[in-house]
Amino acid sequence: MTTSHSDFTLVIGQKNYSSWSMRAWLMLKFLNVRFDEVTVPLYGPESRRSVRALGGETGLVPVLIDRGTPIWDTLAIFEHLYENYPAVWPADQKERARARSYSGEIHSAFHALRGAMPFNTRARRRLSARTAEVTADIERVLAIWGACRGSPWLFGAFSAADVMFAPIATRFRTYDVRLEGPAKDYMNRLLEYPAVAEWLKLGEQETDVIPTLEIGAERGRESHAQPVET
């Protein structure tokens, strides 16, 4: 819990395992918004019920509670924050449209990458083999990074687009996806961003273990049969 007197409460899963919680948390940190933090352990028998009791109607994390009003789903949270914090998205209208499109793509696609490379910031392993689908997802990520010519971030200033890609950068680190040139530089900038580094440090301090996210590709795909975050 970051403060005892704030307008916002963020409901999240464990930092080591919840990529969508990471995105909402990073956004609030980037905006320098004070918030209380409630962690609901993922994949527990009462997980969804606990989230619903806190206002998240889907039972999925993250949920942002703004002065009593719950907002669930990461992109909905971003859009809600944008109403009062325009730094969420790029200032230029055309770039804002691209940033929203790329962020929506992350939200709706990259299923092969997520299935074969479960989010686990503590782990270090290499994939024994990459399927064509996983390779295509990785190549698409790199294509997006290459298409954005902003410096040092995708659209110049740090924005929601960078937040959305931060958990993918951690997956590349976990599974030793080796990059070169500007893509490697951008990944390292994401991993070194202060709020990202803080999240990773806090995740390393957690003691919870979710076996389906510790074993690898086969069990990882199984673990996504019943989503716990969005």
Which ranges hold each PLM region?
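Acidic/histidine-enriched, glycine/proline-rich intrinsically disordered or flexible terminal extensions
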Residues: 203-230
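Residue-level detector of family-conserved "landmark" positions at structurally sensitive sites
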Residues: 38, 74, 182, 200-201
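Active-site-flanking alpha-helical
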Residues: 82, 168-169, 200
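GST-like fold's C-terminal all-alpha helical module
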Residues: 106, 110-194
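A short, structure-level motif marking secondary-structure boundaries and short turns
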Residues: 8-11, 171-172, 216, 228-229
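Conserved beta-strand edge residues that scaffold enzyme active sites
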Residues: 41-43, 186, 204
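GST-like domain detector, emphasizing the conserved glutathione-binding G-site
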Residues: 1-131
